[in-house]
Every structure is written in structure tokens, then in C-alpha cells.
Amino acid sequence: MITIKIFLGYDHQGVKCKDDIINYLNEFGYIVKTPDIINNDNDDYPDYAKWVCEHVLKEHSLGILVCGSGIGMSIAANKFKGIRCARVVDSNDAFTAKNHNGANVIAFSANIPTEEIHNIIDNFIMTKEPSEERHLRRIEKINKIREDIGHDHVQ
């Protein structure tokens, strides 16, 4: 049995979900890694997104980001080549993010109810990577855009 390592990042708003997410994932045998950064009201979500994305890329694993809305974390995460982060609001989004778009990181609001957070996590982890030609073609087109214009291209 292969043990999946999940990298979890959370800012001062997401920290309220931290223990529940860790316990939930540990219950199913997943290894959860978190940054050695102390959360406070002045912390900056890009620091957590950076830590998670660097580890996801290095270890070919999955990442979960939690903040007030999930928006800032997803924007920061998508600056990394090789990261496909989706902001999700429910378990259907988590399924589509992984199965259609090949997401390796998800971001969501700390204000989502606990039961739905569990459903989101389940769908994200258990859903298979894209296999249909149309999804693979679209992911390749996204990758090509990055190569053609550069990730930080500004007009």
C-alpha cells in the first residue's frame, strides 16, 4: 500500500480548520505535512501557498490550501509551473478540478462547513487523474500557453 503525503497550508483564517483536516486525513492513513510557520493576524497567505507548492512539486504529491476565501491562495499557487490549483466550494468542484483539470492542489474557504470540507477532501484525493482525451488535450493547451508566453507575461 502506497501512503499518500498531503501538504496542508493555512493562514490565520484557515488555522481554525487545521486540526480537523489533519485528524480526518490521518484517520484514513494519509501523512499530512504542514509548514513550520507560526500563524498570526499579520501572516501572508502567499507564504503558505509557496511552501505547499514547492513540496507538492518536489514530492509529486497533493496540496490543500485554506484561507478566508481560497481565492488568494489559489492565485499564489498558480504562479508555480507544474501546479494546477483550483479554488473549490463543494465536493463537485473538487471532483471536476482533479478529473477534468488535473488539479494537484485545491484551495477553499475556512468558512465551509466541516462535513463539506471532508467531502471536498475525499473527492479531491480519491478522484482519478484525467484520462479522457479531451481533458488531456485541454491541459496540454494550458501548459503550452505557459511555455509560449511565459508564466508572468504582462502586456
Predicted segment positions?
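N-terminal beta1-alpha1 ligand-phosphate binding loop
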Residues: 5-24
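Short, conserved beta-strand edge motifs with alternating hydrophobic and charged residues
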Residues: 9, 33-36, 63-67
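C-terminal binding/interaction regions
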Residues: 9, 13-15, 91-155
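Short amphipathic alpha-helical segments
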Residues: 19-22, 75-79, 119
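Short helix-loop-beta junction
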Residues: 23-32
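Short, structured coil segments at secondary-structure junctions
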Residues: 28, 80-81, 101
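A short beta-strand-loop structural module common to alpha/beta enzyme folds
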Residues: 31-43
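Helix-adjacent hinge/juxtasegments
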Residues: 48-87
